[in-house]
Amino acid sequence: VMDNNAIERERGITILAKNCAVTWEGTHINIVDTPGHADFGGEVERALSMVDGVVLLIDAQEGPMPQTRFVTKKALALGLKPILVVNKVDKPGARPDYVVNAAFDLFDKLGATDEQLDFPVVYASGINGWSSMEEGAQGEQWGPDMSALFNTILAHVPHQQGDPLAPLQLQISALDFSS
């Protein structure tokens, strides 16, 4: 849904950073989808400069991809604390244990702090719309929705600092239109 550029849809990749917002249990959450490839580094750096946390989504069968390294290195260097989402855990051949271990090894190789290495893990099936804190949970234990993911975001991403009564200030970073 967020990749609405014709080239992005054709190639199945994210080129331009996108954002959307959701409200979960009374909290406004801004979600930014960044490109993963080093060729789009400017977009990645611009987007990461505006966020308070990072959710790293890794396919349960494929594991970390080369582009995962690029974005993760940038996020860790900014001191962002990752939340790992192992997606497509219901896919045949899924290897969630491998993905968690590979992500830990990647974070360590990229110089993550001890605090960044102590990351929460959420297991999910994005296409089927559910998430869980339990690997290998089946049926009702999965939960009917993305509650586990959103609750993890609320628990682990720092709340925005600032005075809500202060005059509005904003920096325009991109303009886009979709019909």
Model-identified regions with their sequence ranges:
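Short acidic, glycine/serine/threonine-rich loops at helix termini
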Residues: 42-44, 66-69, 93-98, 127, ...
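Non-catalytic, charged/low-complexity accessory segments that flank nucleotide-binding cores
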Residues: 3-4, 91, 97, 101, ...
